[in-house]
Amino acid sequence: MGRLGGALGLALQTKRWPVRIHSRTNEGRERAESLGLKTAAPADLKRARVILLCVPDAAVPAVAQALSTTLPRTAALVHTAGALSLDALGTAKGRSRGSFHPLCAVSSPRDSLVGSTVAVSTPSRTLREVLRHMAADAGLRVIEVPEAHRAAYHAGAVLSAGGLVSLADAAVAALGAAGIPPTDALAALLPLMHSALRGLETRGLAGGLTGPIVRGDSGVVAAHLEALPADVAPLYRLLSRRALGLAGDRLEPTSRAALERLLKPSG
């Protein structure tokens, strides 16, 4: 049993859902029991209405295939992977399939899911209502993701989390060019990043924008491009062009034109 399975299990058990955890390993069963979650033997799965596959993405097809050979068609299969289509659960007629992907980083099974969002996808109206009820009881906000656009949705999720870490790495490299050690650089940048996220939360994308782009300060931007490491400058250009779009009509035409010239992709 992994961290997400534990977190979902605890959240739903608190709301009196009849949760059972099935794990192939003694270690997984012991982890579930240590959290106060009840475990299920393979035979118990035949009585389940909904089975959530909280397994690594690569394991979903094989696990779904193994379950499909033993479960009645009345048991719905639901994976928790962000990028996988429902076809990863098999294509047997008569079985409801769905996905339930919480948009949160779960570092411990005891982490609260309250306030996060979950992406739900299923062609079954009945299963959709069950998953929405499940989300509400876990304190999750629901968005529905069309199956055809799952890759774009998941890419956006990755950009907001792993992409943010990569952006922090680039910022640390920029401070490194000024002679600041990586540990000190990250410690200096984290409060700034937190304040930027708070501004984003309270004022939205355009309102949360700060820095030389929104001020139209092409001189500062030119100095930045001159000083940045060669592998960071292209990222700075790309993100600054996005910032130009967010700045909108707050920039005077002459300032915008000067920035656009500076921010053209090099080469």
Q: Where are the regions that the model predicts?
A:
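NAD(P)+-binding Rossmann beta1-loop-alpha1 motif at the extreme N-terminus of oxidoreductases
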Residues: 1-47
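Residues at the starts of beta-strands that form the adenosine-phosphate
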Residues: 18-20, 96, 141
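Rossmann-like NAD(P)(H) cofactor-binding subdomain of soluble oxidoreductases
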Residues: 26-29, 39-111
